[in-house]
A protein has these predicted regions:
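N-terminal leader/signal peptides at the extreme start of proteins
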Residues: 1-9
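Short, contiguous, well-ordered secondary-structure segments
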Residues: 1-2, 19, 57
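Internal alpha-helical transmembrane segments of multi-pass membrane proteins, especially GPCRs
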Residues: 7, 13-16
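Alpha-helical hydrophobic helix detector
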Residues: 15-30
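Amphipathic alpha-helical protein-protein interaction surfaces
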Residues: 20, 37-40
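Membrane-proximal N-terminal amphipathic helix
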Residues: 39-69
Length: 182
């Protein structure tokens, strides 16, 4: 009588394979997390660039109109409801007053974001959208904190966002993953 052929793996072989798979998984997961954070940063930088382009387009339209100072309901841009600051930067839509504050109250920033980025991610004053908007710095700046990544931190501690200054027209990515605070 001969010996039977050996089918399958021994317990030791299975344990070795499981340990090796565990080591591979332990080294791969942090790299995947880093890739996710990098992808979110790239997405926010893209949204910031799109917002900046839209603000620059509105500013150019204001310059073509002769740089007339503060405008309510600027004709020739979008549906004609965009309001421009004294310096020619977007302030909001249908503000109804001639001050240089961004928008109407807390809704001003997300109304401006949603107007300029028609096909982009949405913003709101709460966490129900991809971006949560905040009006601050004397009501002349907006921060749009990226919430699609699950971040629940306050504006000043947010991981990622977009910062807009209606006095200078500057737009930048912000957050703890960048060098700029939101």
């Amino acid at each position: 009588m001969g010996s039977r052929p050996h089918n399958g793996f021994t317990l030791i072989e299975l344990i070795i394979v499981i340990v090796i798979l565990g080591i591979v998984a332990a080294t791969a997961v942090p790299r995947l997390i880093d890739l996710t954070e990098d992808a979110n940063l790239a997405a926010v930088r893209t949204f910031a660039a799109n917002f900046e382009k839209a603000a620059n387009d509105a500013h150019l339209r204001w310059q073509i109109a002769g740089a007339p100072g503060r405008i309510q309901n600027m004709p020739g841009f979008g549906d004609g409801t965009l309001d421009m600051s004294t310096n020619g930067w977007p302030l909001g839509t249908n503000k109804g007053n001639a001050n240089d504050n961004v928008g109407r109250g807390s809704a001003g920033c997300h109304a401006l974001w949603n107007y300029l980025l028609v096909d982009g991610p949405r913003a709101d004053a709460d966490t129900s959208q991809d971006f949560q908007s905040y009006r601050h710095s004397g009501n002349t700046s907006c921060s749009f904190v990226y919430r699609a990544n699950g971040d629940t931190a306050a504006r000043s501690a947010a991981k990622l966002g977009v910062l807009y200054n209606s006095i200078s027209g500057s737009v930048s990515a912000c957050g703890t993953q960048t060098a700029t605070s939101c």
